[in-house]
Design a protein with these regions (language model features):
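Conserved active-site and SAM-binding loop architecture
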Residues: 1-314
């Protein structure tokens, strides 16, 4: 099978193909960020990098059997302020559709898989009309400990959401975390990277860990092994959130926290890899910095979801 991966990132698509038990003859990728490319090359030395997606022409490629990609989503996401197709990053979707159309002219049986964030219906409709397939909504929480709703467009036959594996945060957390330098406050220990404003959202009262919310009750109780989101400590409408037994959706900053044994902390890089169902140390290969690894993981795919989709190729 010859595969073309656009906006390839850290080549989670290649990993998912292997997880699905599929043989890859050639894997060609388009990626422009240095750190993800270094991680990809360290894990998959045979990947052929093609450069900027805007310069790729079907006439220059061998026969392609499968095109995959997750065009940049910042313009569709809440974090990207919902700029939609006016955001040049999200407009790169049309490069994906252009290349698919060009390749179909040479191979009418071409298969594709496109991933993006959950978005407004009117934007989803544009992609659906362009790709001429109905979207499939899958939450990574079915196969991981991460709440990550995503939308997929594919013409691979028979794709359905995977069965729930009932994976909880407690299943993927590292057991021994160095708490040296942690801050004691309100009867809890806090990761020092958590700001004072964010820490003020968390209190321990009557044996409960309470996360302040802009609700009538004023808080929600977090239990051991719950994910916490303290990213908006000054917001009058959002404030803190609790995700029961799961992490929040990872993004390029991976700012979510977890409550474990009276400690409120950020996830380790290994835990972030596990939340995306990557092998431990996958992003350590290639020499990327910790910050680059975190960004690459948050921008990537949940490998187990993609593998379930690819299993329909057998």
């Amino acid at each position: 099978m010859n595969v073309l991966s656009l906006f390839d990132g850290i080549s989670t698509g290649r990993l998912a193909l292997e997880m699905a038990g599929l043989k890859v003859d050639r894997y060609m990728a388009s990626e422009i960020e240095r750190a993800p490319m270094e991680i990809s090359a360290a894990n998959w030395p045979d990947i052929v990098q093609l450069g900027d997606v805007k310069h790729i022409k079907a006439a220059d490629l061998p026969k392609i059997d499968l095109v995959i990609g997750g065009s940049p989503c910042q313009g569709f996401s809440r974090a990207g302020r919902h700029m939609n197709f006016d955001d040049p990053r999200s407009a790169l979707f049309f490069e994906f559709s252009r290349i698919v159309a060009e390749l179909r002219g040479r191979n009418p049986g071409l298969l594709f898989m496109l991933e993006n964030v959950k978005m407004k219906k009117e934007w989803e409709a544009v992609i659906t009309e362009t790709m001429r397939v109905q979207p499939l909504h899958i939450n990574s929480s079915l196969v991981s400990a991460q709440n990550r709703p995503r939308t997929y467009w594919t013409n691979i036959p028979g794709v359905t959401p995977p069965e729930d594996r009932h994976i909880k945060l407690g299943d993927i957390l590292e057991p021994d975390i160095d708490t040296g330098g942690y801050i004691a406050e309100n009867g809890l220990l806090f990761d020092p990277s958590i700001s004072q404003k964010a820490r003020r959202l968390v209190t321990s009262e009557n044996g409960e860990v309470r996360i302040k919310q802009a609700t009538r009750q004023g808080y929600i109780v977090a239990e051991d092994g719950d994910g916490i989101n303290l990213a908006f400590p000054t917001s009058k409408t959002r404030r803190g959130r609790v995700i029961k037994g799961k992490s929040n959706t990872l993004d390029c900053a991976c700012e979510g926290q977890v409550l474990k044994n009276g400690i409120v902390r950020r996830f380790t890089v290994t835990e972030l890899e596990r939340l995306q169902t990557l092998p431990d140390g996958y992003t350590k290969k290639g020499g990327a910095t910790k910050g680059e690894r975190i960004k690459a993981i948050g921008n990537g795919w949940t490998a187990a979801v993609i593998a379930e989709i690819f299993k329909k190729l057998k």
